[in-house]
């Protein structure tokens, strides 16, 4: 679905406004705690000190994660950083998109697919360009076409088994593998996600996991 260029312009301006408010904010501290502060400029991460035109007041004081494309910003995810729920929100009426699609556009033979924007940022900063599905229920069948022409797609979603025996991250991985013919699925340690692994074990842990495929 094509997005109105005026909306893209409005959201792009909002992303710059939020990014300008990042320094010294609670969101900056949060990014540091997740080991991705160095990517704040590259990914235009920000802080909603004041709500931009077109956004609801409920998004105030959140970390802003813009969905940046060649055309501009096509959407946002907002992350609550005070420990409350829900942790993530999107503006009312916003459509689902893949995050960090530039990783596909600029891919040289290989791209990772992960679960969540922070994991995509972490993997990319570690040297492995990654796109994110924005949650276990956010995959859309037409997204699969984005990976046409990519030689190797590595699926690396959360390994988050629940008390009832379900594992939403691994369920998502199976759906992705069914949808993307050239994909390869790798598994993280129980309870782990990409960002957690890199924070705990360093970028080399992801390199070892990915390079073990070869």
Predicted regions and their residues:
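TOPRIM metal-binding catalytic domain and adjacent DNA-binding surface shared by DnaG-type primases
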Residues: 1-64, 102-106, 148, 179, ...
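Phosphate-handling DNA/RNA-contact segment within nucleic-acid enzymes
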Residues: 7, 49-151, 167-168
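Short, surface-exposed amphipathic charged segments that create phosphate/polyanion-binding patches used
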Residues: 60-62, 145-149, 193-208
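Active-site donor-binding loop signature of nucleotide-sugar glycosyltransferases
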Residues: 78, 188-190, 196
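RNase H-like polynucleotidyl transferase catalytic core
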Residues: 131-136, 182-192
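Modules that initiate DNA replication and primer synthesis
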Residues: 140-187, 198
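A polyampholytic, Gly/Pro-enriched intrinsically disordered region
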Residues: 152-159, 201-214
């Amino acid at each position: 679905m094509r997005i109105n260029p005026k909306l893209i312009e409005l959201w792009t301006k909002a992303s710059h406004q939020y990014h300008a408010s990042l320094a010294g904010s609670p969101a900056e501290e949060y990014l540091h705690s997740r080991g991705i502060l160095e990517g704040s400029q590259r990914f235009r991460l920000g802080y909603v000190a004041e709500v931009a035109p077109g956004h609801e007041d409920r998004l105030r004081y959140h970390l802003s994660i813009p969905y940046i494309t060649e055309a501009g910003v096509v959407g946002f995810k907002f992350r609550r950083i005070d420990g409350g729920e829900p942790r993530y929100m999107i503006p009312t009426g916003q459509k689902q998109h893949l995050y960090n699609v530039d990783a596909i556009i600029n891919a040289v033979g290989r791209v990772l697919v992960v679960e969540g924007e922070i994991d995509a940022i972490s993997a990319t900063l570690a040297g492995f360009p990654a796109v994110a599905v924005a949650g276990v229920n956010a995959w859309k069948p037409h997204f699969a076409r984005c990976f046409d022409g990519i030689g190797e797609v590595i699926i690396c979603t959360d390994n988050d088994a629940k008390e009832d025996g379900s594992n939403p991250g691994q369920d998502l991985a199976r759906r992705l593998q069914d949808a993307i013919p050239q994909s390869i699925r790798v598994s993280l340690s129980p309870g782990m996600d990409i960002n957690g692994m890199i924070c705990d074990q360093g970028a080399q842990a992801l390199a070892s996991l990915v390079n073990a495929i070869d």
